[in-house]
From Swiss-Prot:
Keywords: ATP-binding, Cell inner membrane, Cell membrane, Membrane, Nucleotide-binding, Phosphonate transport, Translocase, Transport
Family listed: Belongs to the ABC transporter superfamily. Phosphonates importer (TC 3.A.1.9.1) family.
Gene this protein is translated from: phnC1
Topology versus the membrane: Peripheral membrane protein
Claim: Transcription is one of the keywords in the record: no
Record-given protein name: Phosphonates import ATP-binding protein PhnC 1
InterPro entries: AAA+_ATPase, ABC_transporter-like_ATP-bd, ABC_transporter-like_CS, ABC_transpr_PhnC, MetN_ABC_transporter-like, P-loop_NTPase
Self-association and partners: The complex is composed of two ATP-binding proteins (PhnC), two transmembrane proteins (PhnE) and a solute-binding protein (PhnD).
EC identifiers of the protein: 7.3.2.2
EC category: translocase
Length: 265
């Protein structure tokens, strides 16, 4: 069976106010892969993720989503909204609306697929609400469906964000430091949930992480950035101490698992 490429980034470069953020980045990620994005703070991880979902537009290079150009040479595809509907995003700060209930936050994932009127008025059908409840059950927090999002713990809020991706119908999940602000147990649950969605539903997952032990435990492949350039793309079993020091350089102290008190190199 032919392999489908979910994400392809070709010669992508971006500068902000004259400072290079990413330079000539190339990577290809197949549908159903689970890939860690690693590197020191400021290495370009978040910038790369934001180009993949079209939030940032590169100065040069091309991003393809399932073989269709999302952006190329500073221009976006005319149907970028449709392409982006295939990409779910979760962030360190969860990006929930605290005053809304959990189920209302999950239903936000449907907005891009609704008519303008239904989107503005947030008119959801019984079927759509049932889908939201099903997603909450799948991530293990259905009992919190009608609580305000602000009442949930950090780990629970991150699972709400994942449920939102499911309701959106995302084929790709981009996770930007999804466990950075979580306690060890919550971090483990979030990572296990992402692995479950990847293995059971074939959702392509790309996650930027600082916690190298998590990378080794949950990912088979890692892409490493240093100063905006790809300097490693391979199996996580190859990430020995020497390679990690090359990737992180003087920022090797970032390999301390935050909040876990464990030095990883």
């Amino acid at each position: 069976m032919a392999t489908t490429v979910a994400i392809e980034v070709s010669n992508l470069s971006k500068s902000f106010k004259g400072k290079t953020a990413i330079k000539n980045v190339y990577c290809s990620i197949n549908e159903g892969e689970m890939v860690a994005l690693i590197g020191a703070s400021g290495s370009g991880k978040s910038t790369l993720l934001r180009h993949i979902n079209g939030l940032h537009i590169g100065d040069a290079g091309t991003v393809y989503i399932f073989g269709t150009v999302l952006q190329s040479k500073g221009k976006v595809h005319s149907k970028i909204t449709s392409l982006r509907s295939q990409i779910g995003c979760i962030f360190q700060q969860f990006n929930l609306v605290n005053r809304l209930t959990v189920i209302e936050n999950v239903l936000v994932g449907k907005l891009a697929r609704l008519s303008i009127l239904r989107s503005i008025l947030r008119l959801f059908s019984k079927e759509e609400k049932a889908q939201a409840l099903s997603a909450l059950e799948r991530v293990g927090i259905i009992e919190h469906a009608y609580k305000r999002a602000s009442k949930l713990s950090g780990g629970q809020q991150q699972r709400v964000a994942i449920a939102r991706c499911l309701v959106q119908g995302a084929k790709i999940i981009l996770a930007d430091e999804p466990i950075a602000s979580l306690d060890p147990e919550s971090a483990r649950k979030v990572m296990e949930l992402l692995v479950q969605l990847n293995r059971q539903s074939g959702i392509t997952v790309v996650a930027s992480l600082h916690q190298i032990q998590m990378v080794r435990s949950y990912f088979d492949r890692a892409i490493a950035l240093r100063d905006g350039e790809v300097m490693f793309d391979g199996a996580t079993v190859e990430l020995d101490d020497k390679k990690l020091n090359e990737i992180y350089g003087t920022a090797a102290e970032e390999l301390v698992m935050r909040g876990h008190g464990e030095l990883l190199v």
